[in-house]
């Protein structure tokens, strides 16, 4: 590069302005228009497009009204905690808006009957069951670069087995192979995900670190790269069972927003996942309505606008199902009071410490 190009401009702000214009025009000639621009003039960066998670409470906890498009989202938790259910609800919500969705089933465990019950249009859902991790991530890269896919699910990171591991013997030690695969793939994917405005949801599993004396021994598979590249990380846990008489009909579930680059993190929300139904919308409307003071609770009785809804939670849920007009009014009032609810669902101090430990590893 010539000395003229390296010359530092000194003097008035007019000189600096001219120098900046010259530098910007040189960058645009070399790398194309739009390589550098003022942030305020970039409309795409100002408004974050979102897709509902399928849970009203989680949409409020995320701070932007849903899961962000053009970003990487990680959903992790123990077995049978609702990770795939949450991802499929996001697919169903995207399809309702006319979006195209794809599901890379590395675990080879997707149940189309269950997906249909959650509201997923399985006839339009693209599915791939790859043979190894490299193939799965190449398929993901091609789909993202096409710009035609709105939501892409990868289930799961733990099942992305590197080709070398498949071709080797059962007892071969291959340390860090999957972590290197994920790191390389995310370096390639992250820019095209943003340009194509595709939301990529990685479902991940939990492992235990050996010899941890203080803090949480839990960690996620696939190394640390995904923790850094993800804009949103959701920790989903089953905290109890929902019973009808002696039969278990669902799970009480808690989701913590462990990382959020778009709004304040560390919020948590609880909802019911009913077997064969997914996230219970009526149960959530009832619980959030009580938190916001829209639904009154007196003992075991629930009431709205001086009208009794029923004794006990299940009876009140049945009332909401039978009265869609009242349900719509309560939901509208909850959305209008979302700021108040968001303050109330901020994680409390006993569990805040574990969240801080987890995010410190990011």
Swiss-Prot record:
Coiled coil: none
InterPro entries the record matches: AAA+_ATPase (IPR003593), DNA_recomb/repair_RecA (IPR013765), DNA_recomb/repair_RecA_CS (IPR020584), P-loop_NTPase (IPR027417), RecA-like_C (IPR049261), RecA-like_N (IPR049428), RecA_ATP-bd (IPR020588), RecA_C_sf (IPR023400)
Pfam families: RecA (PF00154), RecA_C (PF21096)
Cross-referenced CDD domains: RecA
SMART domains: AAA (SM00382)
PROSITE patterns reported in the protein's UniProt record: RECA_1, RECA_2, RECA_3
Molecular functions (GO terms): ATP binding; ATP hydrolysis activity; ATP-dependent DNA damage sensor activity; damaged DNA binding; single-stranded DNA binding
Cell compartments where the protein resides: Cytoplasm
List of residues binding ATP: 77-84
Keywords of the record: ATP-binding, Cytoplasm, DNA damage, DNA recombination, DNA repair, DNA-binding, Nucleotide-binding, SOS response
Biological processes, Gene Ontology terms: DNA recombination; DNA repair; SOS response
Record-level GO cellular component terms: cytosol
Family to which this protein belongs: Belongs to the RecA family.
Its job: Can catalyze the hydrolysis of ATP in the presence of single-stranded DNA, the ATP-dependent uptake of single-stranded DNA by duplex DNA, and the ATP-dependent hybridization of homologous single-stranded DNAs. It interacts with LexA causing its activation and leading to its autocatalytic cleavage.
Name under which the protein is recorded: Protein RecA
Organism: Nitrobacter winogradskyi (strain ATCC 25391 / DSM 10237 / CIP 104748 / NCIMB 11846 / Nb-255)
């Amino acid at each position: 590069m010539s000395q003229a190009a390296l010359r530092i401009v000194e003097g008035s702000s007019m000189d600096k302005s001219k120098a900046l214009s010259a530098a910007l025009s040189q960058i645009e000639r070399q790398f194309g228009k739009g390589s550098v621009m003022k942030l305020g003039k970039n409309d795409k960066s100002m408004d974050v497009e979102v897709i509902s998670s399928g849970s009203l409470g989680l949409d409020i906890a995320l701070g932007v009204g849903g899961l962000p498009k053009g970003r990487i989202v990680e959903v992790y938790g123990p077995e049978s905690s609702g990770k795939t259910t949450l991802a499929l609800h996001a697919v169903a919500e995207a399809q309702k808006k006319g979006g195209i969705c794809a599901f890379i089933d590395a675990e080879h465990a997707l149940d189309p009957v269950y997906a249909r019950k959650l509201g997923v249009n399985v006839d339009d859902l693209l599915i791939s069951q790859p043979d190894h991790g490299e193939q799965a991530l190449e398929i993901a890269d091609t789909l993202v670069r096409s710009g035609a896919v709105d939501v892409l699910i990868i289930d799961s990171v733990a099942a992305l087995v590197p080709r070398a591991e498949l071709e080797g013997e059962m007892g071969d030690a291959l340390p860090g192979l999957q972590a290197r695969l994920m790191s390389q793939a995310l370096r390639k994917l992250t820019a095209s995900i943003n340009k194509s405005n595709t939301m990529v949801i990685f479902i991940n599993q939990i492992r235990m670190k050996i010899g941890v004396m203080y803090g949480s021994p839990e960690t996620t598979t696939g190394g640390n790269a995904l923790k850094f590249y993800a804009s949103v990380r959701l920790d989903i846990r089953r905290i109890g069972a929902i019973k009808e008489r002696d039969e278990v009909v669902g799970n009480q579930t808690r989701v913590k927003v462990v990382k959020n680059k778009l709004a304040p993190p560390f919020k948590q929300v609880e909802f019911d996942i009913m077997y064969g139904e997914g996230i219970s919308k009526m149960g959530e409307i009832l619980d959030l309505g009580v938190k916001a003071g829209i639904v009154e609770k007196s003992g075991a009785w629930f009431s709205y606008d001086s009208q009794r809804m029923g004794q006990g939670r299940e009876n009140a849920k049945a009332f909401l199902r039978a009265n869609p007009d009242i349900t719509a009014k309560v939901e509208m009032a909850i959305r209008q009071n979302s700021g108040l609810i968001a303050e109330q669902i901020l994680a409390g101090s006993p569990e805040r410490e574990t969240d801080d430990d987890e995010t410190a590893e990011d």
